[in-house]
Amino acid sequence: MSYNSSYIYEHLEPEGFIPDEISLISKGKNSRSFLIKKENKNFLLKYYKTDDFIKRNRLKAELNFLNLMIKGGFKNVPIPIKFNIEKNWILLSWLNGNNIEKINKSHIRKLIFFINELQSLRKSELINTIQNASEACFNLNDHIKIVFSRLNLLEKRLGYLSFLPSDTYEKFK
């Protein structure tokens, strides 16, 4: 699938959203992300792959989770502006930020705080409004295992992860 500018305009114009500028941000395994500029405002446009071997709709899953977080009081969550389930795209408000080049203790603390906040949603009736994600976690240990599983993949790609105490990391390998 070619996600060129004319392809994107084809999808956004019928929705009444005509971008001034379109730039590719990333080509991930599950989606393509674009920075969309319109009237001096930034937006994020994501196209999800349709050939998902998991056979679940990633767009619906993300949309449901974003709505859960918004209803749950999270403030640093992109807001869905427009979406098209059939064409597999979503337009979101833009959140300013920077890429993390090197993980430090502050990043880890923020991640732990975020996971704790997510855990608070478990007690909410809102949690029953979404399906489980492919890496759904229902307790802190599940979150920790997922994080260390991802760190293991990162270590294989980048080498030793010096920001973690080796004895802590070894327990989860």
Residue ranges and their predicted role:
Residues 46-49, 86-89, 116-124, 135, ...:
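Catalytic cores of nucleotide-enabled group-transfer and carboxylate-activating enzymes in metabolic
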Residues 15-38:
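ATP-binding glycine-rich phosphate-binding loop
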Residues 40-43:
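Glycine-rich phosphate/pyrophosphate-binding loop shared by adenosine-nucleotide-utilizing enzymes
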Residues 1-23:
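Juxta-kinase regulatory segment immediately upstream of eukaryotic protein kinase catalytic domains
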Residues 45-83, 102-114:
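A conserved alpha-helical element in kinase catalytic cores
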